[in-house]
Every structure is written in C-alpha cells, then in structure tokens.
Amino acid sequence: MKMTPAKALALFACACSSSAFAQETKNNSTSGTKPRALARIVWQDSSDPTLKWSDVTRGSDGLSIQPQAVAGFPKLDGEKQSFVQMEDSNGIVVVGIHDNDNGQFQSGWVALSSGVTEEEHGDHSHWHFDQPPSILASKLDQEQGNPAHVYNYQGDIFLANDKKNGFTLLTAAALSKANATTTADSLARFYAGGGGHITLAAVDRQVCYATWMDRDGENQGRVDVIPLDINSPGKGYSLKLPSGGLHGATANSGRIFFAPSDGIDWVEADVGLKQRPDSVKINHLSLGQDTATGKPLRTGAFTNHGSHVLFTTGTKDSATLCIIDAKSSEPVVNKISMPIEEGLAWTTPACVRTATGKQYAFIFGDRRDSEVAESLSIVDLDPNADGNFSDAKVSKKLGVGPSKIVGHGGHHEVAFSASGRWAFIANPGDGTIWAISLSSLEVDSKTKVGGTPSRMVVVGG
C-alpha cells in the first residue's frame, strides 16, 4: 500500500515522540526526578465511603497509581450514606450523595476541582497536574431530595432530586468560575419536574425533559418538559408516552430518547417550547420480546457517542447491543447479538475514540446473583471506518476482577484518558484498578488500591 507524505510524517512524529518519552522515562529512573503524570484518576471508594485520587505516572517499573484521599471531602456515614453517579465538567467533578432515609438524613452533592489544567495547542493539549484536587462547594442536608442520577449536558451538570420531584442544575458557567470561596447556593438552581426515580435529558441549555417512573395511574408515561430559562417559569408542559416505567432518557442530535417498559420512544426536541402536549409526535422503536417472559424488551440507560445512542437489552442468548443513529432521517435500532452467560448481565456501554481514530464500546458482563466469572467485551463500533456502525462487532474479550454489587453500586467501571490512549477499569471486588492500552487492547498494569473502587473519572492524559 502506498504511504502518503502526510502519513509518513505522522509515523515519524509518533516514533520521535515514543523515543523521546522512552528516553525521558530512562532519565527519570536514573536521575531521581519525579515521574511525569500521564493522567489523573478520581474515584469513589464505597468501603469508607471516601473519594480517592491519584496521578497515573510511568517510571522504569511501568504505570503507577498511588491512592490518596481527597482533602476536605465531607465525612460520610457508611451505614446511612452512599455515593451515586458523578460527572466531570472541564476538570470540575460533581459527586452525588444518597442516604438510606429518603433524603431525610443527609443527601446532596459535592463539587471539587480536579486540580488539572489544560493548555491547548490547536490539535492537541498539554495537561498540568500541579495542584491536588480541592473541594469547591457542597450541599448535604435534608432538602436535596436524595439524588440518584447525575448527568452532563453541554458541560452543565444535572442532578435528579427524586424525593423533591425535581432536579438541580449546576451550570458550566458557574462551575468554571468556582473557587474555594464559592457557595453552594451560587452554583445550584432547582427546577420542579419529573417524579419518583427521575431521569433527565437536556438540550442546548434551554429545555430539560424529566421523566416519571410510575407504571400505572395518572403519571404513567409522564414526561415534564421544563424551560431552563429562569425568565420563563411555568411555560412548560407534560407529555404522555404510550407505556410507563420510565427509567432512562437522553438527548442527541436534537432528539430526546426515552426508555419505557416497552422498547424506545423518541420525540423531536422542543427547544423553543412551541408545541402543545397533543401536538407532539411520539415515535416508537420496538426491541422485540423477551423469549423467556413474553414481555416487551426494554433498556434502563443510554450512552451517547457522537450522533449515536447505545444501550443493551435482553438476557442470555437474546442479549443485544443496540445502536441508534440519532441524526438519521428515520432512526432505527441496529442490533448486534451479544449472547451472555446465565447469571451475568451487560452493563451500559462506555465509549471512546482512541488516539488512532478507532471507536470502541466497553461493556462488562457483571454478575446478577451468581458466581459466574465476569468479563469485559470491547466492541469495535466501526471496523471499516465509514462512519456507519452497522458492522460493529466484538473485537476483544478480557477476564476482569470481581464486582461487588450492592444496590446500584459496585459494578465494574471504566473511564478513558483525554488523549484516547488509556482505559482504566475499576474492579470493586478485589480493590484493583487496571490500565488497558487502547492501541493494543491489552492490560498494561494492575494496581492494588485497596477498598472498593467503583465510579471514576479520568482528567487529562
């Protein structure tokens, strides 16, 4: 195959970079200088529960992770409180906190700076790890409604306040200016909308769709459409989807996707709130039927990757990875068969575009009341690189350490470096974090960090 000058130059630059890095590593090991940080990981340790962090460095002995507690993180009661989801917005991490008393003990959120800064250089960035993580603000009391789901839409962080039938918005603008003197109230804004176990989908910082989980009654299939402009209170409306039990919502390419008890429903995003409940066209995508129960197949969570929406459904031989091209004129469900052993269930996909342009979905086979060996499947989403994911297929399957599932927590987790060179996976059951090279898809290192590492974010790298 003929090599173009551009490709030859890229390969030469890569070789020079690798050679320089190898020499730097050698110099570090002989001179005693501090190893260069490749990325920073922040993770939840549910054994305490505490928030931990470490820079990932490479020395003569390979990758190194040295766990430390985040200084100033509020002390949680492990018997009464637990972590829920967390999100990163340009280096600021927001962590949700749940309690076991319907929010009447202390629930809410904590915002912290990762301590990592980005120096952009056109087609790449340099990352600086000069400061440790620091707490910016927190809100833990009896008024936060026991959040469970945390989302990042366009850099804004949304927390679903289940017991208050509403959600909290922490805007990207406010987060970007946050510092040690920031007050929680200056960051957060509450909106009424949604009910029960709420899921959220927001578009263009203008509108948010908030679901109700009711399976019957007057709120079955209800979705509240809420304006985010504080100058437009009371101008929203409510939709009614064909089926209830809503658990899952996302926004992609100007469309909103929902996960009810039957398949997938979607609507065009009403950013200007110009429609009425009876004028909204509700579109339905069937996922088929569960062969064991005869009930319609469903999902419980979505992942966005570019203009694609990914999720899993089914069990055992009928287990499937589903992909929807959200920008298509007529969205359909592209199904990739992924049979799974009895006693395991696929997790929600986590997606990455690597430094070389490959696109992968990482999906764990986690235990469901069984002792079956767990695994990680890595799906090549676009083997022929034509932008169409219809040829997606499992590229690699790896054994992993054990999970330690309690409620919604304790699943395997994965997060990726910003450069698309590394994946880091947490094995809650044996207290390890593994690093996987995204060029070889092989495990590069396994580090015992102790405790029960679970949800994580990676900043920089």
Language-model features, listed with the residues they occupy:
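Short coil/turn segments that connect the beta-strands within blades of beta-propeller domains
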Residues: 37-39, 90-92, 154-156, 205-206, ...
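Blade-level signature of beta-propeller repeat domains, shared across WD40, Kelch, NHL, RCC1
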Residues: 426-461
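Loop/turn-rich, solvent-exposed surfaces of beta-rich toroidal or solenoidal domains
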Residues: 346-421, 425
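A short beta-strand motif characteristic of beta-propeller blades
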Residues: 63-76, 125-141, 177-192, 232-240, ...
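Repeated scaffold domains used in trafficking and secretory/extracellular systems
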Residues: 28-32, 75-90, 134-153, 189-205, ...
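Acidic, serine/threonine- and glycine-rich low-complexity intrinsically disordered segments
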Residues: 203-352
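Structural motif
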Residues: 49-55, 102-112, 164-172, 217-224, ...
